[in-house]
Amino acid sequence: MRIVGSSQTNVVMDAELKRVAQRAIGVRTPNPRKEGLGQIIVPFDRDLAWAAVTYMRTPTRVLWDVARTTAERLEPLYDDLLRDLLEDKRTLWRDGDGISVEARHVENFPAGERQIVGTVKNAIIDAARRRGATLHLDPDRPTLRWIARQDDRGEMVLSIDLGGGSLSQRGWRREAGEAPLREHLAAVLLMLARFDPRKDTLVDPMCGAGTIPIEALHAGRGVPRTPSSPQARAALKALGLNGPKSGPPEPLFADSQPLVIGCDVDLGVLGAARDNAYEAGVDKEVVWQRADARSLSPALVTDIAREKGREVRSGLILSNPPYGERLDDEDLYGLYRGLAEACRRFRGQPWRAGFIVGTPLFEEAFFDVLGRPRIKKPLANANLRAYFYLYELQ
């Protein structure tokens, strides 16, 4: 089983897989084999595959590698895949299923992408027919998505996309905002910042579309993805990956009730974030506060907590501030400097502050106020090179 995420997230995905496997199905996973900077590979197990697709939040895809070949021409590619699929006696499809096939990273194969897709499609459909099942091509609404790609060694690997598409799409986003943070990357930030929903109050001072607050609540509770993903349901059902228990999957940490606060200076942005939270089922659980990020203070957080009958024990400031697309360098530096000053007000308390930013101006502004970060990690955000910074404020 191949778990795929953004670059530089191998360690995070491994940690999440171990936690999910232990909580959801009561097993310890072996140490994975890492491939590149954004993929981990573990032996395929049906219950583990179900748990990964249902509960993991940091990957973009979960794949089941079912065949591979060193073929360098279309004819042997067809022959090798057909042979592997005929010899594999596991459930790989259901009679009558629609499939789609896509080719990725096949630039070094001596044939065009469409030729590769057609060859792979023929091998799958022919193998299914010889095993007693009839499949048909349905690129728009497939039950199973098949992916053929060349790995780092030049081998062609054929996989089934167990999630039925991108796992980053949770199904709740109605308003994206001007510079949305992808959902899986928000989950990565929460892991890197060591968010503990049992005791941490989370504050996003520039919440935008609300991705971080929404993801904090879902990740904190271990909310299953499946109810909002018909593609994942169809794929899991077709492969007989139904999990160890009957009935719909339950949250892994149902009693988790973290205090989560989303702030923004723009009322329209806050309204859009609230709409997204409504679609995600957490609109009544996120506290939305109109506030300039530079005015954030412990007193504001304490007042909000008191209104909710909560106590602030420790906290995490986590945000995806602007990178400068609509601000000149002077204004951007001033914004970052004001944000750093706001974080400094939490000094002496058990708080941390984490940010994903794509400009060196951020580190310069924060260094003048808070010094060096405890963690500086490269990450990619929407194909932009960025860094995650974590500051210890206590």
Predicted segments, located by residue:
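Conserved S-adenosyl-L-methionine
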Residues: 181-298
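A short, flexible beta-alpha/helix-coil linker loop
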Residues: 106-109, 166, 322-326
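SAM-dependent Rossmann-like transferase core, predominantly class I methyltransferases
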Residues: 158-194
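Non-catalytic nucleic-acid substrate-recognition regions in nucleic-acid-modifying enzymes
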Residues: 1-142
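Short conserved loop adjoining the S-adenosyl-L-methionine
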Residues: 295-311
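SAM-dependent methyltransferase catalytic-core segment centered on the flexible catalytic loop
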Residues: 223, 227-247, 306-317, 322-360
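C-terminal edge-of-domain segments
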Residues: 146-163
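Conserved Class I SAM-dependent methyltransferase catalytic core
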Residues: 1-8, 12-16, 20, 263-272, ...
